[in-house]
Amino acid sequence: MPIVIFRERGADLYAYIAKQDLEARVIQIEHNDAERWGGAISLEGGRRYYVHPQPGRPVFPISLRATRNTLI
């Protein structure tokens, strides 16, 4: 399970996966509201990860464990 660092740049959210030296813009988040944040996350370029939903929108930057699952 890679550690993904999420950070905001202006109005965009970016994800950095150190193990792959990859940084990409987040284009979709399954849960992105005041009560819950996370779930299936789609990155620019087609990669998808799953982050266990957090209680509310986190303060960025934040490091979270993610799984890469081709079935999501």
UniProtKB/Swiss-Prot annotation:
Disulfide partners:
none
Segments forming a coiled coil: none
Top-rank lineage group of the source organism: Bacteria
Q: Which InterPro entries does the record cross-reference, listed alphabetically?
A: NifT, NifT/FixU_barrel-like_dom_sf
Which keywords are on file for this protein? Nitrogen fixation
- Keyword Signal set for record: no
Record SUPFAM superfamilies: NifT/FixU-like (SSF159203)
Q: Name one Pfam family in it.
A: NifT
Instruction: Please tell me whether the keyword Cell membrane is annotated for this protein.
Output: no
Question: Which is a GO BP term held by this UniProt record?
Answer: nitrogen fixation
Q: What is this protein called?
A: Protein NifT
**What species is given as this protein's source?**
Klebsiella pneumoniae
